[in-house]
Structure formats: C-alpha cells, structure tokens
Amino acid sequence: MTTDTSGRTGNPAAAAPAERFRYGFLKGNPQLTKNGELKHLLTIEGLPRAILNQILDTAEQFVSVTDREVKKVPLLRGKSVFNLFFENSTRTRTTFEIAAKRLSADVINLNINASSTSKGESLLDTINNLSAMHADLFVVRHASSGAPYLIAEHCAPHVHVINAGDGRHAHPTQGLLDMYTIRHYKRDFTKLRVAIVGDILHSRVARSDIHALTTLGVPEVRAIGPRTLLPGGLEQMGVRVFHNLDEGLRDVDVIIMLRLQNERMSGALLPSAQEYFKSWGLTPERLALAAPDAIVMHPGPMNRGVEIDSQVADGPQSVILNQVTFGIAVRMAVMGIVAGTSD
C-alpha cells in the first residue's frame, strides 16, 4: 500500500509470481491491548490460538440466534457500526450488516460513491469525520493492502476496526468463518489434510486461511495451483506445494476452492478460462480423489465452469452455503468481542 501524508491510499503494486507470502505491516501486534485482548481484528497472522478459539467458541453460542423467532441479542445496543466498503461486496457486507443488527447495533452503510471521498477527501479525513460522529466500530474493506491498519492507527481511541478485506493481504473474518465451518464438520483440526486450490497469489482469503490453519494445528496444509499463481514463502509456512491438481487432492479432508482474481492480475498469467478449468477445475472425478467424506468450500463469488463444476458446487459434499450462514455468527462474535474491549 502506498500513502501520502494526508492518508490517501493508492492501488497495490502488481504482484510478481515470487511475491512473499507474508506482509510486513505488523509492528508488535496493534490488534491487541496491553492485556492481550482483541481491540481490532486486522489479520489472523500473529494472533494466538486462544483468541481464535475464543472467537469460534463465541460464534457457536450465536449460531442458535438464527433459529429464534426474535433474532436479536442486546450486546451492542446503543453502539454505532459503520460499514465502510471501498470495494464491491455481496456476502461480506450483507452478513456484517445482519450480524450487527442481530447484536442490536445501529448500522450505517457509507455510500462511498456518494461520499466526500469521491470529491477528493482523504481516507484519514473521512475517518476523522466519522469518528467525530461518535462511531464505535468501523468495518473496512479497501483495495489497498494495509488500509485498515492506517485507520486503526489514526482513529479515536474508543473506536474499533475490523478488516473486511484489504487488497491481497488479509480477510480475517472469512478465514475465521472457514475455520468455524471446518470445525463444525470435522471437529478436530489436528488430524486433517486441507487443500487450498487456485489463485493463491492474489487471494487474501488464502493468506488468512493458511495462517489460521497453521495456528490451529492442522498438520498438513496443501497449496495447489499453477506456478504463476502461487506466492513465494509458502514452504517456510510449512505448506506443501503442488503444481498438479490430481496429486494435490489425494486423500484430503477439506478442499477450499478459490476463484481467479482477474481484477488483481497484470499481464497474461493464464490461458483461457476453458483451459484453466481443464487443468485446475474441481470436477466430480477429481473430487473422488479426496477422502470419501471430504467437504468442499469456496469463499465466493464462484465462477462455475472455471474453478468448480456445478455438480460439485451443488453436490452433497459442498458446504458453500453453510459457510455463508455460519459467517453471520462468526461476525457477530468478532464484533461482540472487539466492541467489549477497552484499553
């Protein structure tokens, strides 16, 4: 991420295939208070296992709220949650809004195209003005890696920041809802083989998932994809790298498929979508190479016929829609935990 002194953020630089897996934003851990409590959620990287389990356990308690006649709890009553989405979103923005409302918060969705940012107002000036309106929590999605860190560093002390996806860097709540989904179906992380397939180079979800999986003790994490779409540094994380889909899928318990992020690519990294599907698309035949009870996941949006066949996406081993459902409870848990923390 590039910033000028006013806090304007620029687009991330185009990635090279050998881009390192880790980003260098963390100085200490700005997400935690001096007492080790979660004040902001900016990335899964660097968070202890205890905090990840705290979030997953809290989400477990909120899942039942969905089944109630009155789908509300008063945990954030009187709090103001601002959704600041500088990038398009369907699932993430909607589930954050639902989650905040189920916690009884007041929710403000900032229309970026109609806001003063479209008139040249800097990111920090926007944040300072919203803080002056006594915001309690910012949910931020931004095209620039590191933008939520900038906001957390400069916002008022009482304000909490949740990263809803920043560039290629991180998507921590997606990573957490993926972990919740895996735990729901598989229970024990320490006996699993998990495969992440596709455009890992440009995927903030893949980065968050890998940090979460390794922190939670998954013994074998596999990254599967063409050489042009895998970042450097995966092996140093303990990840097994495969450049052949059939080999990488053998006997895995969990398959996480990723879409091609064409909007973040520069240059011709791949052949056509049809050719990609032939080599890297998850078909029923390829799914049969995995464990018989393997589950199939996808963070969305899906591109059917590119990275996944419709028979798999809609089949009995797919838990893709369950991920969306669980995402509400996980985001309720994250907001409830960070908003209840003070320095």
Curated annotation (Swiss-Prot):
Pathway linked to the protein: Pyrimidine metabolism; UMP biosynthesis via de novo pathway; (S)-dihydroorotate from bicarbonate: step 2/3
Alphabetized GO MF terms: amino acid binding; aspartate carbamoyltransferase activity
Protein name per the record: Aspartate carbamoyltransferase catalytic subunit
Subunit and interaction comment: Heterododecamer (2C3:3R2) of six catalytic PyrB chains organized as two trimers (C3), and six regulatory PyrI chains organized as three dimers (R2).
UniProt keyword annotation of DNA-binding present: no
Residues annotated as binding carbamoyl phosphate: 91-92, 141, 171, 174, 300-301
Organism whose genome encodes this protein: Burkholderia mallei (strain ATCC 23344)
Gene Ontology CC annotations of this record: cytosol
Keywords: Pyrimidine biosynthesis, Transferase
